[in-house]
Amino acid sequence: MQSKFLWIAAASAATAAAQVPARLCGTAQPTMDDLVIAAGLAAEGKDNRRGLHPEDPIVVPTLFHVLAINETVAGGYLTEKSLQDQLDVMNADFGPSNVIFNLTATTRTVNRRWAQDLDEIPMRRALRQGGQETLNIYFMPYVSGYLGYCTFPNFWDAGSDEFIYDGCAVLSDSLPGGSLARYNLGRTATHEIGHWFDLFHTFSGGCGCVGDMIHDTPAMLNATGGCPVGKDTCPDRPGLDPIHNYMDYSDDACMNEFTPGQNFRMRSAWYNIRTK
């Protein structure tokens, strides 16, 4: 299953460059298969906490694939500095979770269709490297109208379309220093990689008992816009909305944490699915 971020320019009389986008979810709730896998990871983790090696860092082989319309920054041809800044944000955000991203290669492809998020499977068959333990991120100037999307882990057959599709697509303008106001600190990649580690949105399930299937993320009815401190959309449930969580939809500057329960889920997904 993939998770997509939809961004829509705010309606105003201002110029397009001055418009501030809103971040909206463009994805259905996790499938039953995703929920079953998440429940299994939770159960496995409770029975085998030591087997998850919490003291050992998870080192993720990572590849950056730059897809561009032409060899200009506006066309998606990102600079080495932008890519390094994005990698630094990823490692800083996941550092407290004891996760390290080791960039093993960067590819650059000028292809108008691929840069516009078309011909996804042929593109990924040409570029994707490694197994399910390898994170392939595709940066492109247009992601079908979204900020990004990624896949949850699953037990796919090597070489299948699902296996080839595994990875994340991220809008070029969302990298640190990009042109997308409020969403240009690199946190789109952080959020999407959370999905790659089997994390759901914090607002999944609303105020229901199951929620995002993480015990220490407070329930929330809907996604967050901006950074509204004190937001509480489930007043009958413990805690305020986790607006600072990377798996909400707050502004990039508002995001700063994963919970211990989310860290545990990521580690469980890594050892029980991604490195199996």
UniProtKB/Swiss-Prot annotation:
Disulfide bonds, paired cysteine numbers: 227-254
InterPro entries xrefs: MetalloPept_cat_dom_sf, Peptidase_M43
Carbohydrate-modified residues: 70, 102, 222
Record keywords, A-Z: Disulfide bond, Glycoprotein, Hydrolase, Metal-binding, Metalloprotease, Protease, Secreted, Signal, Zinc
Gene Ontology biological process terms, A to Z: proteolysis
A Pfam family of this chain: Peptidase_M43
Domain of life: Eukaryota
Coiled-coil region: none
Signal peptide span: 1-17
One GO CC term on file: extracellular region
EC class of the enzyme, as a word: hydrolase
Location in or out of the cell: Secreted
Keyword Transmembrane appears in the UniProt entry: no
Function comment: Secreted metalloproteinase that allows assimilation of proteinaceous substrates.
Record-linked PANTHER family: METALLOPROTEASE MEP1 (AFU_ORTHOLOGUE AFUA_1G07730)-RELATED (PTHR47466:SF1), PTHR47466
Protein name: Extracellular metalloprotease VDBG_07883
Native organism: Verticillium alfalfae (strain VaMs.102 / ATCC MYA-4576 / FGSC 10136) (Verticillium wilt of alfalfa)
